[in-house]
């Protein structure tokens, strides 16, 4: 009869609505596919692509920062060794030293120079050594800065094998040699100090970009949520109402 048909149609509509609400609660999404809202779904998908892109950019920046930070650690250690070398050179500048003492001081000085060589060789991360390689060679840091892949943060190689190791060429075999070594140490110390300033600035710049990208990603994620997320409190209330309606519909049919 007509009443039964109307009750059946109403129950079918209730069941359909119930299925939609349950799907929104289960997925947490009001717009789960383009069938729900093509405009919102398309925009959300594009924004999800941006979030994924920012994640890749941040991976590049993190690799760059780690490379720079390893170089900073190496340069700081070299700075400490240079201070020890300067103390040895000052000792050796004493013209009254006996031969045995000068030989011992020179041996210590040579060992410190070798330590610098080891530090330079060890200051590598992920195959890149900013201290060892010369300024024109490959391997320098070039990290993606943003979704615009042509925008990068670059950090040049510092050529310490030439600017530090080779520059410390004089030993402490005589007072004259010690005086020359002191001049070399002062020159190299200035180079290392300048390098630390350059690398520190680069590390802070990368860190700042990482922070900005993280905030940008959070804002985009929030925007995606505004477009497609379900209001779970509202949907839960709908679910309860539809369940009651469904029960009444079943009773009406019976």
How would you describe each model-predicted region?
Residues 1-254:
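Primary detection of the long, small/polar-rich alpha-helical "axial" segments characteristic
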């Amino acid at each position: 009869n007509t009443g039964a048909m109307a009750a059946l149609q109403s129950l079918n509509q209730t069941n359909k609505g119930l299925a939609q609400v349950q799907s929104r609660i289960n997925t947490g999404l009001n717009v789960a596919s383009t069938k729900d809202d093509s405009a919102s779904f398309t925009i959300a998908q594009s924004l999800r692509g941006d979030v994924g892109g920012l994640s890749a950019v941040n991976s590049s920046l993190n690799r760059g920062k780690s490379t720079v930070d390893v170089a900073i650690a190496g340069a700081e250690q070299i700075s400490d060794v240079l201070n020890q070398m300067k103390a040895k050179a000052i000792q050796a500048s004493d013209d009254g030293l006996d031969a045995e003492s000068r030989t011992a001081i020179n041996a210590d000085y040579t060992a410190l120079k070798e330590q610098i060589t080891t530090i330079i060789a060890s200051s590598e991360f992920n195959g890149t050594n900013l201290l060892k390689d010369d300024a024109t060679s490959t391997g320098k840091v070039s990290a993606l800065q943003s979704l615009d892949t042509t925008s990068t943060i670059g950090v040049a190689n510092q050529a310490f094998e030439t600017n530090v190791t080779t520059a410390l060429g004089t030993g402490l075999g005589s007072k004259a040699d010690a005086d020359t070594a002191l001049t070399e140490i002062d020159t190299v110390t200035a180079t290392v100090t300048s390098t630390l300033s350059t690398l520190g600035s680069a590390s802070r710049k990368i860190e700042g970009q990482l922070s900005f990208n993280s905030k940008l990603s959070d804002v985009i994620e929030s925007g995606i949520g505004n477009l497609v997320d379900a209001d779970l409190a509202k949907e839960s209330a709908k679910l309860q109402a539809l369940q009651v309606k469904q029960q009444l519909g079943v009773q009406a049919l019976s």
